[in-house]
């Protein structure tokens, strides 16, 4: 189970939502909220950032990027909806976007992982919800800023 920080509501523009139909959006956001026991606004932000992350992958096919823990929750949810995910990948990327946690560990070691992903998103004019990429962290808790296997895959080793 993922724990979400409880704070005052944050107004974040959902700029990537248009990459999928309203019906698919509703299905994915509801799935995340239910499965992770979180409030809908946070589930919406997670899904929006997941779509932005996947768009980045499509825009930069020769590079590999690392999702944050929170974005990985959205990616896992999308992967569970195979038809919708496959259609999205074909439409946005021209081919399937694979999720490879092992590859993510190599990226983290080579490029700085999430920090580099956020830089690339901004460079490609993809809106970044900073809280989902930084404040909730992607580190293993020892303070050195390095990701570990469980954080690269969304925490607790689920689904890897």
Task: For the regions a language model picked out, list residue spans one by one.
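Acidic, Ser/Thr/Pro-rich intrinsically disordered cytosolic tails and loops
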Residues: 2-160
């Amino acid at each position: 189970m993922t724990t979400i920080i409880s704070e005052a509501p944050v107004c974040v523009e959902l700029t990537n939502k248009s990459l999928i139909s309203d019906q698919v959006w509703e299905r994915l956001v509801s799935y995340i909220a239910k499965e992770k026991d979180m409030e809908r606004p946070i589930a919406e932000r997670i899904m929006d950032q997941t779509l932005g992350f996947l768009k980045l992958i499509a825009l930069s096919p020769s590079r590999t990027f690392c999702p944050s823990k929170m974005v990985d929750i959205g990616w896992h949810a999308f992967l569970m909806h195979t038809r919708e995910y496959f259609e999205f990948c074909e439409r946005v990327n021209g081919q399937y976007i694979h999720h490879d946690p092992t590859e993510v560990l190599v990226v983290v070691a080579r490029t700085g992982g999430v920090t580099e992903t956020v830089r690339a998103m901004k460079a490609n004019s993809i809106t970044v919800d900073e809280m989902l990429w930084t404040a909730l962290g992607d580190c293993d808790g020892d303070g050195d800023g390095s990701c570990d296997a469980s954080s690269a895959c969304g925490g607790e080793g689920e689904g890897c």
